[in-house]
Amino acid sequence: MDRNLIVLDNFLEDPDYIRKRALELDYDRVQSSVPGLRTMRLGGDLQIEVEGKLKIAFGCKEIIWDMTQDTLCFQSCMEGTETWIHKDSQGEDQGEWAAVLYLTPNPVLDSGTGIWESHDHDMNIAVGNVYNRLVAY
């Protein structure tokens, strides 16, 4: 499995403010390919802050967003939400990287991001859900 992984703790300067903004949004977008609910695409200050941090993490001058995908949105999976193995990146034409930023204080133990080579294999990588942690893969 040839997969890169970047884990950045304390990713946002003011995660409590971003979380507060996120909780004020409507979560009504249901997608059959991913669990939970999502908001519409974000932009503005949050996008600028995330882009700046990602440029440093990846050592690049520009971030090219794949706007055909669910880019820069908040997702909510409440307790009891069914989750399953799914693909966040569908191929080279739809983005080389995906990322999750955790903004839940005191998350459920054993929650986080798991990476599988395929549905037929065991999990290759597990990264815990830690408040203000970005996981890029």
Report each predicted region and the residues it spans:
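Fe(II)/2-oxoglutarate oxygenase catalytic core
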Residues: 1-137
